[in-house]
């Protein structure tokens, strides 16, 4: 009847709206990094620049958070994630949190060197956070010298991330998620995905390649030209993302956000992308 159908449609709409809200609330970083704690030092001149972060959020649909799996089931999740790390020859350290498990390639010690982290939830939703690879002081000085030699002016306190090194870190960590779902025989079509950029605004890509030097001489520096933001949510069961891979998605969206011209028809753009993927060294400054 009409009223019954109308009531059913209202209920379906309400459920869909609630699920979208759950996904939006999920898509925010919850793994702690030292910069999340306000600095209490009065000397602001000694504070370090905020660490650029890229986070990938994968929300598993069709399961309710209230449906907590058994301990045996959760242990099988840990075994699978450890196996994913082992398959890539990476060490795996597990930290328990209040409603998730955090997997790192090194021991998580507050205030120590910052590393990537995967947060795994009981329903097998996942969050990946990858810090950009910042240049050390020597490399920063060398980058500024080489850029100046190209008659490009950048401020002395400009923030750089190593293009090839960061790409390798992002794709290597995202590959762990691909391995995990294969080991668990889960389809990516069960997930909704979004990504987030933090402390990335104005951060420049740097590479010691001849191709990069030529490119920035013609087009200027590549850098993140937007403020920190979170992407739209993509539903991987939409028929478009049947070949989705976390590795490819994370790598391409991170570097496109940094100004890298991915998918461009230009030969010059494609030559640059290939050079950064290879990480071929330059002879500049030698």
What are these regions (language model features)?
Residues 1-286:
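Bergerat-fold GHKL/Histidine-kinase-like ATPase
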